[in-house]
A protein has these predicted regions:
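A structural motif corresponding to the C-terminal lobe/cap of the Radical SAM core domain
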Residues: 3-8, 12-203
Length: 209
């Protein structure tokens, strides 16, 4: 799922072939740390329409230890500015509900997204896919059963975590965009909208109006 996990030489050869044989606008997905000015310039010349980028989590230590992504938040922010410089539209994909995550750790994902000038951003629920280390961790810690299946990234969490309940995960997920886009002095109001109650739903509807 990382289009730029290839050498610069191969990208240049692919770009020449693409412009010669296909020459249509396209979308691709990669990670922020694969971006360079040279690579984005090549993609722009190829006719890129937009990009999707996996940020996944905003806490630097959690991202390194749990996701094995040893890249600083500062570098991620700076790398994404390259897309803004070349006027390439992009979306940032985030995940909530990882094993061992807390609400405060998840708020770091919101904080880093507030520093990124993406034209769209998404938050998905963690999915413990078969064959992944995080699924093994979830099973070892008793957060899921061995036969647990996930049907969709948009499905509610299947993890049972006392420190970060399914309701709390779902509430933060639905309020992700308001937290990123609205002023911080409205955060107390947004927090109320995390609750799936009559009051919370009413506030949520007013935020999205």
């Amino acid at each position: 799922d990382t289009f730029l996990a290839l050498s610069d030489k191969y990208l240049e050869e692919f770009a020449d072939m693409y412009k010669s044989d296909i020459n249509l606008p396209f979308w691709c997905q990669t990670r922020p740390e694969t971006l360079t000015e040279e690579r984005v310039s090549i993609l722009k010349d190829m006719g890129i329409h937009r990009m999707g980028l996996g940020l996944e989590h905003g806490n630097e230590e959690f991202r390194a230890t749990m996701l094995d992504r040893k890249v600083s938040s500062k570098k991620i922010i700076e790398d994404l500015k390259i897309l803004n410089h070349f006027d390439v539209k992009y979306s940032v994909n985030n995940i909530v509900g990882f094993p061992n995550e807390t609400r405060e750790l998840a708020m770091d994902t919101i904080r880093i997204n507030r520093q990124i000038n993406a034209d769209t951003r998404n938050m998905y629920t963690f999915s413990p896919f078969h064959g992944t280390p995080l699924r093994d961790i979830a099973i070892q810690q008793g957060l899921i059963e061995k036969d647990t299946l996930v049907k969709s990234l948009s499905s509610p969490t299947v993890l049972d975590m006392p420190q970060f309940s399914a309701s709390a995960i779902g509430g933060l997920k639905r309020c992700f965009v308001p937290y990123v886009l609205l002023e911080k002095d409205r955060w107390p109001e947004i927090k109320k909208a995390e609750s799936f109650t009559e009051e919370g739903n009413t506030i949520w509807e007013s935020l999205m109006a």
